[in-house]
């Protein structure tokens, strides 16, 4: 007799419906799984056998063949334990008569029949809804995550016994839909009010966050670069529900999701160590998991002491900085993961950190300085919209009483600028100025004849590329938004151009 159940295999963040078939015949005792299973799926034979035996005792010691279709798609992970068990149970027990044609099953089984949580539940649930399935049966610990998806019943089960009761017609109360609420700025520790001075850098940070622009801070050790970067979560806007779904799906596949929380509520702020490998950064490995740049999707990737990373590692950032996605190649296909992040980096001007200082002597040779800065290639630097110098703060300013402007005040301005951008791009499928393409640039970044001449002079004097020009216009548009100006004025353009000219010009 042949029994069937449906599950979903993940391919990156995309799902493919898998039909699990069980054929049980009265031949010699054996248990085979075919259809490109990986090691974890092959090992499910022992887990399923013990789980059924310890739950119902109704395991058929005959010839069992499990087919996972389509046969040309690799199935990875232990999430197929439950649908395999369901097909076997339905084949040998004619009391399990519930119609499961519109149901997806996922879950790992313990030897005693408990359902263990699995990764990738949110993208699996989204795929199930997209494919028209009415419900998904899954481990109870995964229910919170799956409940972010409306329009599909989430049936949580603690063990195989509960699933058997469900298959026999008993009802399990669906898990309620979870309403998304983003986390607000007062939940973060770092606040701009504690950053003394640094008015140029603070302004640059506000502009960068308002438009989602990449930013590089250059300054001596202890000048406040890292402190400024750590204030970004306190001024960055909350995620939309759609952004939270995307981000949560990535963390779910990666296996980094807090199952009690079930959702990523705040924008990611990812800080890779400078020894991180290429695979750790961009993703890959045997199971092709997302990398750290994908974990920073819809948030911030902060590289402290940028030249300490290998040049090869830094060059891996070029494609995602341009496209917002990273393509990870494997033997027979390419898997794409979202990687639309705001890059924020900091560095010293030279190995000793004193180059350009008015009070300390730089002990580096010209060769050492060139070698240090050469870690950051011209094409990568060209993709960084805002480059700002962070000088040391004078003592009197450092000990002055009273707080500086708070993060909450800055955040209010950032939110207003972002609202302008969302309204502007509501029909374009983008959310902020940094995501503009050439069509949006031509429509929303029109310069007056006078400002166009200014742009031309700067283009020629600074030796800018076409990409640099586009990025200057995007930054100028953001500065205009902060001023509530419909047009890009001369002062907006001058400020944007100023962020492209620094001590790094000779790099």
Residues of each region from the PLM?
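Peripheral, non-AAA+ core regions of ATP-driven protein-machinery
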Residues: 1-216, 220-226, 264, 329, ...
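Basic, amphipathic alpha-helical bundle interface domains used for macromolecular binding and assembly
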Residues: 34, 40-45, 60, 67-77, ...
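Walker A/P-loop
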Residues: 216-258, 323
